[in-house]
């Protein structure tokens, strides 16, 4: 509640996504939390990204009753069972996920025409991203694919999955635009910092404003612009698909 109050007080936040390194719908209270944010920070967009594995009919029906989201992004690698399940991993089953997404779209079309649904995926050697994008667009969803990245060096299979050339992600804008806050209040430099190698501070001990504007955070951003990554191993290791 204190974090939401701070966001509301400054009035400059365009988007709040109440999750980071997890599947948000594993949290049984995610809709209540999202509604709280939407009520107390009415000027911002509440946006969620999900793999749709837990986006069941019951959850979708609950969203329809009182929708807090401006947009729902669904991460779904491809539109074929084998490549999808091998890429997504875990216990996700292609038919179940596809059924969940189609029910969401059906209910959106009936009851929530203003809710934006975007199907997203990463272009890799394992899936036919172009065909998947065409399929979802044919059903009325927005759809796109993005280029593969090694997530600050945290994706060991990058070279096998990469299509084409690769380069250092030196034009990234994440560290200038987004504050990534973990479950314990630690603000990390990037959404790819799974192991908390670049912790800027803790918003529970101070505030979002203080951590974002701390000398360490400011210096890291300035050095990134200069191309000096000596004290920033996360960005130094980050490689994306494509040429400079």
How would you describe each model-predicted region?
Residues 173-175:
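Short, small/polar residue-rich loop motifs at catalytic or cofactor-binding pockets
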Residues 177-179:
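Hydrophobic alpha-helical transmembrane segments of multi-pass membrane transport proteins
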Residues 181-184:
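Short, acidic, Ser/Thr-enriched surface-loop or helix-capping motifs
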Residues 99-102, 106-116, 134-170, 186-187, ...:
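C-terminal accessory region of radical SAM enzymes
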Residues 1-152:
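Conserved glycine-rich "GG(E/T)P / GGGxP" loop and the immediately following alpha-helix
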């Amino acid at each position: 509640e204190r974090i939401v109050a701070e966001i509301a007080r400054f009035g400059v936040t365009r988007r709040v996504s109440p999750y980071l390194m997890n599947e948000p719908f594993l949290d049984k209270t995610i809709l209540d939390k999202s509604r709280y944010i939407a009520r107390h920070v009415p000027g911002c967009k509440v946006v969620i990204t999900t793999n749709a594995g837990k986006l069941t009919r019951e959850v979708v029906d609950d969203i329809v009753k009182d929708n807090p989201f401006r947009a729902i992004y669904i991460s779904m690698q491809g539109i074929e069972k084998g490549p999808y399940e091998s890429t997504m991993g875990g216990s996700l089953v292609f038919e179940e996920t596809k059924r969940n997404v189609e029910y969401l779209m059906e209910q959106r079309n009936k009851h929530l025409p203003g809710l934006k649904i975007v199907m997203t995926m990463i272009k890799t050697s394992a899936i036919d991203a172009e065909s998947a994008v065409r399929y979802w667009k044919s059903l009325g969803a927005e759809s796109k694919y993005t280029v593969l990245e090694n997530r600050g060096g945290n994706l060991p299979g990058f070279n096998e999955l990469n299509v084409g050339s690769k380069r250092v992600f030196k034009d990234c804008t994440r560290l200038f635009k987004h504050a990534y806050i973990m479950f314990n209040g630690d603000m990390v430099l990037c959404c790819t910092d799974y192991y908390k190698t670049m912790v800027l501070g803790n918003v529970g001990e101070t505030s979002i404003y203080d951590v974002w504007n701390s000398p360490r955070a400011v210096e890291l951003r300035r050095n990134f612009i200069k191309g000096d990554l000596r004290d920033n191993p996360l960005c130094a290791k980050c490689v994306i698909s494509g040429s400079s």
